[in-house]
Amino acid sequence: MTMKGGVASQDFSAAIATACEPAANVWSKVCVALKRELGDAAFGSWIAPAMLREAATGDVVLVTSTGIARDWIRRSAWRRIGELWAAHDATGRRIDLKSRLEFEAAAGAYVEATPKAVAAEPIEIVLPVSTDAPTVVAPSAKSPRTQGLQERFTFETFVPGPANEFAHAVARRIANWADGHFNPVLFHGPYGFGKTHLLNALAWEAMRNAPEKRVVYLTAERFLSTFVRAVMDRQTAAFKEELRAADLLIIDDVHFIAGKQSTQEELFHTLTALVGEGGRVVFSADRPPSAMTEMDAHLRSHLSAGLVCGLEPADRNLRLGILERKIQTLGAAHGFEPSIRPEVMQFLADRFTDSVRELEGALNTLSARAGEGLSRMTLDEVQAILRPHLRSGEKRITIDDIQKATAEHYGMKQADLLSERRNRAVARPRQAAMWLAKQLTTRSLPDIGRRFGGRDHTTVLHAVRRIEALRAEDSALSHDLETLTRKLRG
């Protein structure tokens, strides 16, 4: 009986251990299977960066850094994740999927909150070593001062160029705790121009240079949600104290609170208090303060009082530089040769001109599909993979549109582009228009030639090659092509 009792006791203990198995252990087992089934590229791009978080209630949430990653997982892997989780988790815990912003909004998380106020902590995931699955370590729990910051956004990974070199220099100066003559500082530019990268890099560098100083980084959306929660919980005094104790306060996307009166008032008082006490404040927005018509006039005035620094669209050389840096990062992360065919690189730089994020997203798509074969992908293969994305919401551009825009830009008549005139004042704009037609439409070379006064395809091919060669050395021509491309794409 004793032996039986001993066996029963051991079985019972094993059952209890299994039932109480930490979520991190369960997720590690799920990841081993997912990595084997999805492959290194897809797993590394979409699953590995996600973090498992466990709340005090026992609920488990897989948190992705972006909504795009969340959507990919939901579409491509979520059903399988659910099956694997159910198979390995004896307790039957429910696992949910959220983007970082969704999770933080739901939890009321705050970048500088004390440990007691944090609703959930990241769980470190270590995949067991096996013959078919190398060890993978997910990011460990961040200290409160670094929550909300993205480790990949540093000055080392930021590519400066004419479009952002002034903003880059200003951010570097702030991060070095140089004199705060301009305070506050506001960086502005449309979505995808590098503002968030710059602010993250600034925060990381400022903390590295002065570990004893208090740096607070948060998005305007988190500022709003945390303020609302503080009001509801009657904790506004603690909220104010946390912010106003900062040596450097960084708020991303401040335009988000435009029209939200009480939140604007709180930010206004925080700003004036910090500046008055010698603290430094940095904002980003999608437009300059003068264009924030829904913003409170007093707050808008204070945002304008320091240094307003715009980020311009990345030119072609900067886009190529960003692609090169991104390819090196992907190669280092996934263990393959960081290279890509020149014609593919040029295609990406020429087609994704509106946003650096769109440019990086296109490269991520190719990397996820090709993995180690990225360097071998042909231009036709790349165009086939990205074609659905290129069609999405893209304005249809006609050769007539191109001719009209080119003629207007160079101060000439559209008929001049179709004429037989060969003097440089006409020939160069005509060649530029042919190059644009090749880049922005799906028309064949013979068709383009017919629409330029009945010229043959060899004339068009010569024009395209001539412009391709010239724009690398002629900055004025390169600027003209950038301007026309943006105008045509709306």
Curated annotation (Swiss-Prot):
Induction: Expressed throughout the cell cycle in synchonized cells, with a 2-fold increase 10-20 minutes after time 0, just prior to replication initiation in nascent stalked cells (at protein level). Residues 1-91 are annotated as: Domain I, interacts with DnaA modulators. It is found in: Cytoplasm. SMART domains: AAA, Bac_DnaA_C. Disruption phenotype: Probably essential, disruptions have not been isolated. Its main location: cytoplasm. Transmembrane segments: none annotated. Domain I is involved in oligomerization and binding regulators, domain II is flexibile and of varying length in different bacteria, domain III forms the AAA+ region, while domain IV binds dsDNA. This is Chromosomal replication initiator protein DnaA. The gene is dnaA.
